[in-house]
Amino acid sequence: MDYRINNEAVAACVAAQLVRNGCKSLSTVVGLTNLLMHEKERKRLLSTDNEKELSTIIGQLDGGLLTIIMNSLVLMIQGGCMTFEEGDLSLTQFGISMCEQMKDRRSKMLSNILRDMPAIMEKTVRMKENMFDQRYVIAL
């Protein structure tokens, strides 16, 4: 647990920023949030450009945070920050406002994740678009 912010709050913030930055698919948001919240794998991913290594890192992720991530997304949807329609997530005006106010640097974990997010997104976009859809089958 991080200073003043727990893992569910971090997951909610990370997922909201991913949606804000163009990730719409539920599977992709869940997969990238899971990847970003695992510090060791995030650092490994940042240090490589080998596509096979990228696939290996993603394949080795455990699902320990998936319940937390899904709970966070449900709370964000129920709280009016996000909407979920036809398998895609989108931010409401309240969610956009929340993302713009995520400047509080008291959470080192969240700061590090948000700092690494653009590079991770760029590396994973180069891979197959459906890599998380194959890894995380989410039945609704």
Language-model-detected regions and their locations in the chain:
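Short, well-ordered coil↔helix boundary/capping segments
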Residues: G59, G63-T67, E85, L89
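Exposed, interaction-prone assembly regions rather than primary DNA-binding/catalytic cores
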Residues: K103-L140
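Accessory beta->alpha helical hairpin/"wing" motif in late/C-terminal subdomains of nucleic-acid enzymes
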Residues: E85-K108
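Short amphipathic alpha-helical interaction segments
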Residues: D62-Q78
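Short, amphipathic alpha-helical interface elements at domain boundaries
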Residues: M1-L61
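Short alpha-helical linear motifs
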Residues: E51-I57, S72, R115-M117
